């Protein structure tokens, strides 16, 4: 096993988003009046979503509610100190209402899932970051915002096509740190109901 992959397993894939990248995301977001639900299904210690919530420009009559899901017990306890509600669980084992969230902040674990698929397109879509996106994108309400932080190498043609079919007003920019070769994809969930 490659040392970098082994290190990822030791940390349970936990690599928090840097503050400069979070600031770049926050300055691009605006919320209207009303209740706004912000979800981080890989919330770690909750600091990223808490920072986003505190820096997002929002209407004075809007109420921001932060929700996190975290697998690691110690990190979930820390997250509960700065987020409104934290569930200690695997994001894949949770039931989150479809169309219930205004913002989905997603910096998922990265890497290939063990698969016997030989087809490259299927292999590309079996990556962890893709699986997290597919599982959690339905939690966004129509016109809700996805803030996805992934290595640019994960943006295979199949994954890019998946995102392009489901998002509109897409903006992509490099993360502030070059350490993981990450990009941020911001996009609004498209209306999938058809004409």
Locate predicted features.
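S-adenosyl-L-methionine
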Residues: 1-33, 48-50
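Conserved Class I SAM-dependent methyltransferase catalytic core
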Residues: 125-186
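Conserved S-adenosyl-L-methionine
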Residues: 54-65
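Active-site regions of enzymes building and remodeling cell-envelope glycoconjugates
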Residues: 83-88
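Conserved proline-anchored active-site loop of SAM-dependent methyltransferases
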Residues: 25-28, 37-54, 68, 72-73, ...
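Conserved phosphate-coordination/catalytic loops
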Residues: 15-20, 123-130
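Core SAM-dependent methyltransferase catalytic element
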Residues: 183-195
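Conserved SAM-binding loop
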Residues: 79-80
